[in-house]
Structure formats: structure tokens, C-alpha cells
Regions:
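Zn-dependent metallopeptidase/amidohydrolase metal-coordination segment
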Residues: 332, 339-355, 359, 404, ...
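Midchain, well-structured core segments that form catalytic/ion-binding scaffolds
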Residues: 101, 106-111, 152-153, 158-361
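Active-site-adjacent substrate-binding region
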Residues: 230-253, 372, 389-391, 396-439
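Acidic/His- and Gly-rich active-site-bordering loop/insert found
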Residues: 3-109
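Short, conserved charged micro-motifs
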Residues: 71-72, 273-280, 365-371
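Acidic, glycine-rich active-site loops and adjacent beta-strand->loop/helix elements
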Residues: 82-84, 146-154, 176-180, 218, ...
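His/Asp/Glu-rich mid-to-C-terminal helical/loop segments that flank catalytic regions of hydrolases
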Residues: 164, 229-244, 312-321, 328-332, ...
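Active-site metal-coordination/substrate-binding segment of hydrolases
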Residues: 70-148, 152-153, 159-160, 165, ...
Length: 477
């Protein structure tokens, strides 16, 4: 009997993974708030007869005994993360701390109801691995399941994983990939920058107030989508406001988090007459192909009592316009892969501070240093101070033995060659390298489109192929 037959066929695989994904999605799980989702996972693991262990960071680990006759096989760690980037559609009322994702199947895709991101990153990979184990049909060796927290805010959970949790294992397969048919053997470093300047405001001028809104952008993942030419509404609106005659800003905000491309931005501005939006519309025209849903609107606003001082306004706008956003360099060792980039992800007022969030990624230290130095010079010149966290890169290795196993399995199952790649995202193997130097690691995931956005979705027809790849690798090791 073939592996596909043992798993019940393609439709049964799809149904099983989707059902498991729905179970895992029943609890809210924004980064640093994964405890309820972790309890849901614990219950699922106990239902499989396993004994999950939790550490102080909320990470979970559970050992899975080998199938009969496979006790001498090398131990494989299957690893994913619990948290998700909670992109929220403006005006939807969705609360990431209280509301679970509404999971839907529509047009051949798994997606949310459009109010929020789906969270297939990374729970779809987790669901595939867990469903396979629930079937009892996979002839695997000793396994360890490892689920981390706060991956989306700088791999924080991975940094707290004890080396003992990685010990006595030969291989680690990370399920946090976005492209079916690809094995990832390297990833970019990440530098999470939070810039802050004391908000300097004074009495509002005696002028009409207007609310300017840029909305409908596609947004997306600041690593996986940074090369797609999508607009950054924060930068577009800042550039427009810098050229608005007589305009005084009361507020300027946009975006959600460091590592998501912003999909919207909004400003309230005092202006003698209704602002002429034609320069902004002309700027949007350059993004019509990559960001067709972008729209701009202007409406009268209830005037706030205070507005930014002219000096603070000039500095803040110059800082926003000067921050690098987009691809900085391509990686020649892996043609077609972005080597370095920066994302201006969020801007807005926090109490009496104006805060700006950026995320730098790089496969090479010198590129990250160049971008970081450029930002530091800019921030210092305009009165912004920096708080920074980060994580190392994972150097790509084309001779990766685990990727070779995945490649053989993929060829046997599909007749196609598995792509070998480094990726322009942060992956937890970059942190695990120092904790377990001899551990052979690779990453492979299902297809996920527009992660970190309300348009996030996953094609259903690829789920059986992904499950068969995972199961085949478990049996081949």
C-alpha cells in the first residue's frame, strides 16, 4: 500500500489538515499572547497520548515514540511557531486579543473572513504535521515536536529554548515555509528598530481640519513580499504632506508592526483650503499594477486642539521620507533571492512620543551595517532615539543532507525537482545553530500567499503534496 493510500487519499488529507487547522485556530494568538492557543495545543497533544512540556517562555515540546521497528532511526525535530501577525482590516472591529480567526474555504483557498489575517503562517504547517501523527499511518522514527512563541517579533521564543530540547536529535525540519516545492537551507538576519522622539505640539491653528486617508493597499510580509513593488502608504503620505502648502499636522499614523508592509495610513491636517489630492493620486498611479486597490480620500475632520510644531513636523516628515524601504541588494549566491531590505512598518503616536518601527533583513553583515548606519545618521539628525533587537542569519548550505532527503522524496512523489533556496525572512534555525551546532536543519512549508495581510490565503490543492513530503521525509530518515 502506498503512503497516499495509507493516508486515505488526497481529499482525506486535505480534510484532515483543514480540520486540525480549525482546531488550532480556535484561540487568539498574537505574538506574546499565545497562552490560550498553547493550552489548545496541549489538549490536542494529550489527545494523541503525548505529554507536552512548557517552558517559561510558553514554548512547547513533546516527544513522540517511534513506530514499531523504527527505534534505531535518527531523531527528527518537527518545529513551528504558535503566534501570528494579526493584520486587521480598518473598521472591521476585530480584536486580536479576544477574537479567534474565522476560517473559511472559498474558491479553492483556505482564508479568513477578510477582517484579519489567516494565521496559516505558521499554523498550517503545524496542522499538517499534527494531523499526520494523528493518523498513525506514518512509519516514522523517534520524533520531537517543538512549538515556539513570539516568532513574529524577533524569534523571541526560539531564543529561550533550552539546548536540552535540541539535544540527542540529528535533524530539525522547520514547517514555517511559504512555497511548496522548496527546501530552505538559509535565512536572513533581522534587525527590529523602534525609533522614538518626544512629541512637540502646540495650540492648533485657526484653520479647517481635514482627514486624509490612504487605504486599500495589499501590505504583506516584509521579507517574502518586499520585492513585489507594493506601495508604502506611510511614506507616500509623508511625502505628500511635506509638499502641502500651509499644512499643519495634528496626527499621522499607519501600519501595524515592524515586519508587515503597511496597507494604510491616515493624517489629520489643518489647511486653509481643502487639500488638492492630485499630487498624491499621481504618486499612486506608479503602483497601479502592484497595488491596484489603493485609494485616497479627504473629508472634513473635527479639529483637534493641538498640532505639531513646524519644527517637529519638518523633522518627523524628513525622517519618514528618509528611512529606507524596499530591496537594498540581491544575493548572488542564490539568484533571484533578496539579499538585504528595509521595511518602514508602522508610525504613530504613543502617549507623548512619536514612534516609528522599521525592520531590516540581510544575508550579509556588511549590508545590514550599511542600512543600520544610514538609519542611525538619519535618526540622530532628526531627534529620534533607537531601541533595537535582532537575530542572526542562517548561512545557506547547498550540500544540506536533510534538504537532499526532502529532494529525493519530492522527486519520487511528484517527478519534479525540489527547489533549494535561502529565503529573505527570519527562521528559527538561525537561533538554534548556536544551541545545537551539529543539528542538521532545513525548512519546508505549504504554499501561503500574502502572509501578514488580511488577504492571506493558502491553496487547498497543495496540502496533500505537502503532507506527503513531510510524511515521506519522516519515513526516509
Amino acid at each position: 500500500m502506498t503512503l497516499l493510500e495509507r493516508l486515505g487519499g488526497r481529499e482525506a488529507i486535505t480534510r484532515g489538515i483543514v480540520h486540525t487547522f480549525r482546531i488550532l485556530s480556535r484561540r487568539p494568538r498574537p505574538s506574546r499572547h499565545e497562552e490560550a492557543a498553547g493550552e489548545e495545543l496541549d489538549a490536542y497533544l494529550r489527545g494523541l497520548g503525548l505529554s507536552p512540556v512548557r517552558d517559561g517562555a510558553g514554548n512547547r515540546m513533546a516527544d513522540v515514540p517511534p513506530a514499531p521497528g523504527r527505534g534505531r532511526a535518527p531523531r527528527l525535530i518537527l518545529q513551528g511557531h504558535l503566534d501570528m501577525v494579526c493584520a486587521v482590516r480598518p473598521g472591521s472591529g476585530w480584536n486580536p486579543l479576544a477574537d479567534p480567526v474565522t476560517v473559511m474555504e472559498e474558491g479553492g483557498f483556505l482564508r479568513s473572513d477578510g477582517r484579519a489575517s489567516l494565521g496559516a503562517d505558521n499554523h498550517l504547517g503545524n496542522a499538517a504535521a499534527l494531523w499526520l501523527l494523528s493518523t498513525g499511518a506514518v512509519n516514522h522514527g523517534p520524533l520531537r515536536l517543538l512549538f515556539t512563541t513570539a516568532e513574529e517579533v524577533g524569534l523571541e521564543g526560539a531564543k529561550e529554548v533550552a539546548p536540552d530540547w535540541l539535544a540527542r536529535a540529528e535533524y530539525l525540519l522547520n514547517t514555517d515555509g511559504f512555497h511548496l516545492g522548496r527546501a530552505v537551507v538559509g535565512s536572513a538576519s533581522g534587525r527590529r528598530e523602534t525609533w522614538a522622539a518626544p512629541l512637540d505640539a502646540g495650540p492648533a491653528p485657526a484653520l479647517p481640519a481635514w482627514r486624509l486617508t490612504l487605504s486599500g493597499g495589499r501590505g504583506g510580509h516584509s521579507g517574502d513580499d518586499i520585492n513585489r513593488g507594493r506601495a508604502n502608504p506611510i511614506k507616500l503620505l509623508a511625502a505628500y504632506l511635506a509638499g502641502l502648502p500651509g499644512g499643519r499636522i495634528a496626527s499621522l499614523s499607519g501600519g501595524l508592526t515592524h515586519n508587515a508592509i503597511p496597507a494604510q495610513a491616515e493624517a489629520v491636517v489643518f489647511c486653509p483650503a481643502e487639500p488638492d489630492l492630485s499630487p498624491l493620486r499621481a504618486a499612486l498611479a506608479g503602483y497601479r499594477a502592484a497595488d491596484p486597490g489603493l485609494t485616497v480620500a479627504c473629508a472634513p475632520a473635527e479639529g483637534p486642539e493641538r498640532a505639531w510644531t513646524p519644527a517637529f513636523q519638518a523633522h518627523a516628515l524628513a525622517f519618514l521620507m528618509g528611512l529606507y524601504h524596499g530591496v537594498y541588494a540581491m544575493e548572488p549566491a542564490f539568484p533571484g533571492t533578496v539579499g538585504a531590505s528595509a521595511n518602514l512598518g508602522r508610525a504613530g503616536t504613543e502617549g507623548d512620543v512619536y514612534e516609528v518601527c522599521a525592520f531590516l533583513r540581510s544575508t550579509r553583515p556588511e549590508w545590514e551595517a550599511e542600512l543600520a548606519g544610514r538609519h542611525m545618521t538619519l535618526g540622530t539628525a532628526h531627534g529620534f532615539s533607537l531601541s533595537v533587537t535582532g537575530y542572526p542569519g542562517w548561512p545557506g548550505d547547498r550540500a544540506n543532507p536533510l534538504a537532499a532527503v526532502l529532494g529525493r522524496v519530492w522527486w519520487e512523489q511528484t517527478g519534479r525537482t525540489l527547489e533549494l533556496s535561502a529565503v529573505h525572512v527570519g527562521l528559527e534555525p538561525s537561533v538554534f545553530r548556536a544551541k545545537a551546532p551539529g543539528l542538521v536543519m532545513a525548512s519546508a512549508g505549504p504554499d501561503i500567499l500574502d502572509a501578514h495581510s488580511v488577504d492571506e490565503r493558502a491553496p487547498l490543492d497543495g496540502l496533500p503534496d505537502y503532507a506527503l513530503l513531510l510524511a515521506g521525509a519522516m519515513e526516509a530518515l
